[in-house]
Amino acid sequence: MVLSADDKTNIKNCWGKIGGHGGEYGEEALQRMFAAFPTTKTYFSHIDVSPGSAQVKAHGKKVADALAKAADHVEDLPGALSTLSDLHAHKLRVDPVNFKFLSHCLLVTLACHHPGDFTPAMHASLDKFLASVSTVLTSKYR
């Protein structure tokens, strides 16, 4: 998916506003995903997925850190996410549909925390960005 100059600006602006809340938002998005799409819990059977779990907090931070890295390297998502793509494709074997579920939950979380900034243009830019990240993460599944 091609990100326009406006999309890239929106992505950078959004990630700038997230600041130190990335881990918190990542955890919240994961909890939303577990509640809305309970089958996603099967990929996390080795950890405690209950609300407030230290393990979900830690994974939420990993998600947020990976997305921050992607936002910082939006011109080269495949290069920035290559290791993570290998991990999800070859070791974790996460069903690609789960990236869509998490992307949706991330959008909801960001909209809840930044309603004034979550314009239709911002929504569209973030949706395209998350779809691009998902595409990169699933590119090595073939």
Curated annotation (Swiss-Prot):
Keyword Metal-binding appears in the UniProt entry: yes
Residues that bear Phosphotyrosine: Y25
Record domain Globin: where: 2-142
GO molecular function: amyloid-beta binding; heme binding; iron ion binding; oxygen binding; oxygen carrier activity
CDD domains named in the record: Hb-alpha-like
Modified residues (N6-acetyllysine): K17
Residues given in the record as heme b binding sites: H88
Cellular component, GO annotation: haptoglobin-hemoglobin complex; hemoglobin complex
Keywords linked to the UniProt accession: Acetylation, Heme, Iron, Metal-binding, Oxygen transport, Phosphoprotein, Transport
UniProt: O2 binding residues: H59
Residue numbers carrying Phosphothreonine: T9, T109, T135, T138
Residues that bear N6-succinyllysine: K8, K12, K17, K41
UniProt tissue specificity: Red blood cells.
Keyword Heme among UniProt keywords: yes
Annotated Pfam families: Globin
GO biological process, one term: negative regulation of blood pressure
Family: Belongs to the globin family.
Function: Involved in oxygen transport from the lung to the various peripheral tissues.
Record note on quaternary structure: Heterotetramer of two alpha chains and two beta chains.
Record-linked PANTHER family: HEMOGLOBIN FAMILY MEMBER, HEMOGLOBIN SUBUNIT ALPHA
The protein's name in its UniProt record: Hemoglobin subunit alpha-1/2
Organism of provenance: Rattus norvegicus (Rat)
Lineage, highest ranks first: Eukaryota, Metazoa, Chordata, Craniata, Vertebrata
